[in-house]
Each structure stands twice: as structure tokens, then as C-alpha cells.
Design a protein with these regions (language model features):
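Glycine-rich phosphate/ribose-binding loops and adjacent secondary-structure elements
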Residues: 1-50
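C-terminal extensions of enzymes
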Residues: 49, 53-202
Length: 202
């Protein structure tokens, strides 16, 4: 089902093989982004696939059994493909964690899987980029277990310096900070800049 694809990808699955689009269609089950509905319970299609733009739910229900199954199956296949594309785009945008958390909130039983991510998020640290072009979004307590946050937490805990003064300042527009003019200008404001530990935040 489309709902399970983001979770599977986040857990490392990269190949899918499913006959669900046909099996669901045989029982008039219509796949949606966050649920599965009986076709008889739907009045309007929000999907824009070639089936849903040409037929209404009532029209599909009136078709002969074989043709009806074919139409629903084609839509279901589109729904699965669309979800795969949304997951791929969320990875490209660096938003897979946010997308997975959003999808898990579509159903209470599915949200029970959140424990898998929060209790085992250390496994994701090594495969998650520490630096991203976009800021990360923090919505709830579960987000404190994001791999990026755990990675920085581990870095801070292991970091040691003999310098007794720390200066916290806003992150530079270009990274790494120590190669920028902003950093050079900042250092010039202190008489003994080599004895100071400069820390940048965003």
C-alpha cells in the first residue's frame, strides 16, 4: 500500500514487487494517498490519473466486472507509482524524515511504528548527511531523534578544546565558516583570537 512505501524506504528497502493493485481492485478497493476506500463509498475522485479524470466512481461501478477491475487496478498502480515518486522527491529535497512522520500520522496503528524510528535512529546516523542545503523542521517530540540531531549531539559530546573562552555567533552565509571573510572579520575583533573557540549556530 502507498502508506507503507515511505517507511520501507526509510528502513533501507529500495526494490518493491507488489500485486496489491490488482488484488485490491478485485474487491473494489480504491487506493488513496493515506487510506484505502471502497469505491461505493466515494462520490468524487481527487486523483488526476487517466482513469479518474475520465470516469466517476458511479460510472466505474457500472462497468462489467473485468473492465471495472482493470480500471481500478490501473488507478491503484498509478497511486503506488505516485507515492514512489513523492518519496524520491522527499529524498531529493532532504525531507524524508518529515515525510515519513507525516505519513505515519495517517493512521493510529501506523503511528505505532514511530517507536522503531525513535528507538533505533542511531542506525540511520551514518547514512544521513549531516549538512543540508535546507533547514530541518521540528514539529514534535519525535523529531529530537532525527539522525541529523543525534549526529550533532554526538559531535558536541565528543568535542574537546583547551580554549577557555567560547564565542557563539550566527552561522556564516558560506560554509565552511573558517574560510569566509565573515570569520576573518570576527577574529580581528579579539586581541588573542587563537585562545578563543568560535562556535557557529543557525
Amino acid at each position: 500500500h502507498p502508506l507503507t512505501i515511505p517507511l520501507a524506504v526509510a528502513l533501507g528497502c529500495d526494490t518493491f514487487d507488489s500485486a496489491s493493485y490488482v488484488l485490491y481492485a478485485k474487491h473494489d478497493r480504491y487506493m488513496e494517498e493515506d487510506r484505502t476506500s471502497r469505491l461505493a463509498d466515494i462520490r468524487y475522485f481527487s486523483c488526476t490519473c487517466e482513469v479518474c479524470t475520465k470516469f466517476s466512481p458511479k460510472e466505474i461501478l457500472s462497468l462489467e466486472s473485468e473492465e471495472k477491475i482493470g480500471k481500478i487496478a490501473l488507478h491503484n498502480l498509478f497511486a503506488i507509482k505516485a507515492e514512489v515518486d513523492r518519496v524520491k522527491e522527499s529524498i531529493h529535497q532532504g525531507r524524508l524524515w518529515e515525510y515519513v512522520m507525516k505519513k505515519m500520522r495517517a493512521h493510529p496503528k501506523l503511528f505505532e511504528a514511530v517507536d522503531i524510528f525513535t528507538k533505533n535512529s542511531n542506525y540511520f546516523v551514518n547514512t544521513t548527511p549531516k549538512f543540508k542545503k535546507r533547514s530541518i523542521f521540528l514539529f514534535s517530540k519525535e523529531d529530537q531523534y532525527r539522525p541529523e540531531i543525534l549526529a550533532f549531539k554526538n559531535t558536541v559530546q565528543k568535542f574537546k578544546t583547551r580554549k577557555k573562552i567560547a564565542v557563539l555567533t550566527k552561522n556564516t552565509t558560506i560554509r565552511p565558516a573558517y574560510l569566509t571573510n565573515e570569520y576573518s572579520i570576527l577574529k580581528e575583533k579579539f586581541k588573542d583570537s587563537e585562545s578563543i573557540q568560535f562556535c557557529f549556530y543557525n
